[in-house]
Design a protein with these regions (language model features):
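Bacterial Sec-dependent N-terminal signal peptides
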Residues: 5, 11-37
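Short Lys/Arg-enriched alpha/beta "domain-start" segment
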Residues: 35-66
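Exposed beta-strand-loop-beta-strand "reactive/processing" segments of non-cytosolic proteins
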Residues: 62-110
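Active-site-adjacent substructure of cysteine-protease-like catalytic cores
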Residues: 81-101, 328-396
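Structural recognition of the beta-strand scaffold that forms the well-ordered cores
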Residues: 94-95, 105, 240-251, 295-298, ...
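Catalytic Cys-His active-site segments of thiol-dependent hydrolases/isopeptidases
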Residues: 107-108, 113-123, 369, 373-415
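Active-site-adjacent structural segments surrounding the nucleophilic cysteine of cysteine proteases
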Residues: 121-308
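Low-complexity, Gly/Ser/Thr/Pro-rich intrinsically disordered linker/tail segments
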Residues: 398, 417-439
């Protein structure tokens, strides 16, 4: 991966949850259509990267959690036709694991970051997922970032031990000195022993929000008739991204217990902590799902939601509802520092993208965790006393866990590519969200 320093220009938005169309070419036949390319990442290589990401650590193969592949295909983002003068193709591996044990979206170009998105649960249908407003915006930014990585002309990372092009020189290891057990690399004509380590870390609480809900059936049970039948919504209006985002944040604290005279039964609500638990054959709703649907409708009414196929609220009304619910928070233009500090304090974040403040035409969802990979390289002289020659700390991957709350893709970890997020003119975060009595 190139040493691209990223600014996390948030990728969350809200208001009317309008969908930006993002087209992909049909899945390709890997054997017949993949051109011979020195940068091409094979399926086996992509699978290894996927397993590392899903294991939550990249330090040793022993720590990798094994999953069985259910299916795999490649797709090419159609916008790649305008990518570069060299005709860079934006190609990804989509790897799904059996028993809904997760998926990974892995780059097929070795010049880029290996894993762009992954989840420990569920599977990814790329065409359905990009109908999700938030994930579609993410894929738009990911495509731009992918192209930028292939065009990067800055300094290369030093060749690492597992790089087949590494000019490793044979040595005779001396068991009594652990440095001599390290692999060797050659840089600028000098040979060094290299100690390379990757450390994965995230906010102390891990995922902050204990629920995974959606805008469709059964959570939209009380949202009124849609007038037509929809595969995702049933015959009901959508919950709305604003009410859903706020509702999921409330679940962290199980507070308040009522709004506008509507009482929330948190014991029942928390029984419906996952979309799969609540959704049974598109018809039968659990008691927990009904309690959740009741709460989400009450929140939407307080926001003056405009119910329909794309239920909408304003940013002003969303902020006012949080105040009505006796919550403390801050709301400002996007700041990476504020985002990370909020998550490190175990306070969830709602990120909003919009074209005009208080107007319809945006989107919102929740970010409830961050994960990063720090990479450390220590180079030792290849001669006695084998002291440290120099050290490098390489900026690695940064991921954010997003509760999309829409379509079949409810949540996933996504690469920080938001320097390239241009779907909206403005980006705002609501952060440090907690009840007033919480301090």
């Amino acid at each position: 991966m190139k040493k691209l320093l990223l600014l996390f220009i948030s990728f969350v938005a809200f208001c009317s949850c309008e969908n930006e169309e993002f087209d992909f070419a049909a899945p390709v036949d890997v054997q017949s259509e993949v051109a011979v390319d020195s940068f091409y990442v094979s399926f086996d290589e992509a699978l290894a990267q996927a397993e590392k990401a899903l294991a939550g650590t990249t330090t040793t193969r022993a720590s990798v959690v094994k999953r069985k592949v259910a299916n795999h295909h490649e797709f090419v983002a159609s916008r790649s036709t305008r990518a570069t003068g060299d005709g860079v193709e934006v190609r990804f591996h989509v790897i799904n694991f059996e028993d809904n044990q997760g998926f990974a979206l892995v780059s097929a170009d070795s010049r880029t970051t290996p894993v762009y998105a992954y989840s420990e649960t569920g599977n990814l249908d790329i065409e359905d997922a990009t109908e999700n407003t938030g994930f579609g915006d993410f894929m738009d930014a990911a495509t731009e970032y992918y192209i930028a990585e292939t065009e990067w002309t800055g300094p290369e990372n030093p060749l690492l031990p597992n790089d087949p092009n590494n000019p490793t020189l044979p040595i005779t290891p001396v068991p009594t000195n652990p440095i001599l057990q390290l692999p060797t690399v050659e840089l600028d004509g000098e040979r060094y022993y290299l100690d390379y380590r990757e450390v994965v870390s995230q906010n102390s609480a891990g995922r902050i929000v204990p629920v995974i809900w959606g805008q469709g059936w059964p959570y939209n049970f009380y949202c009124g008739s849609l007038g037509v039948e929809d595969d995702y919504l049933g015959n009901r209006c959508a919950v709305g991204c604003g009410p859903l985002a706020v509702g999921q944040v409330l679940s962290v604290y199980r507070y308040p217990i009522f709004i506008d005279g509507k009482i929330f039964n948190w014991n029942k609500i928390m029984l419906s902590n996952s979309y799969n638990e609540a959704y049974t054959d598109g018809a039968i709703c659990s008691e927990g799902a009904m309690a959740t649907a009741y709460m989400l409708k009450a929140i939407g009414v307080n926001m003056n939601a405009n119910y329909g196929y794309e239920t909408s609220v304003t940013i002003d009304s969303m902020i006012m509802t949080l105040r009505n619910l006796n919550y403390n928070f801050a709301a400002n233009e996007y700041s990476y520092t504020n985002m990370i500090n909020s998550l490190n304090s175990n306070y969830p974040v709602i990120i909003c993208g919009y074209d005009g403040y208080g107007l319809f035409g945006g989107h919102a969802w929740v970010v409830d965790s961050h994960r990063k990979v720090d990479k450390f390289e220590t180079y030792y002289h290849s001669y006695e006393p084998y002291d440290v020659a120099f050290r490098n700390e390489v900026i690695g991957e940064r991921y954010f866990h997003c509760l999309w709350g829409d379509s079949d893709l409810i949540h996933s970890w996504c690469l920080d590519v938001f320097e390239y997020f241009n779907s909206y003119n403005n980006k705002l975060i609501i952060y440090n969200i907690r009840p007033l009595h919480h301090g």
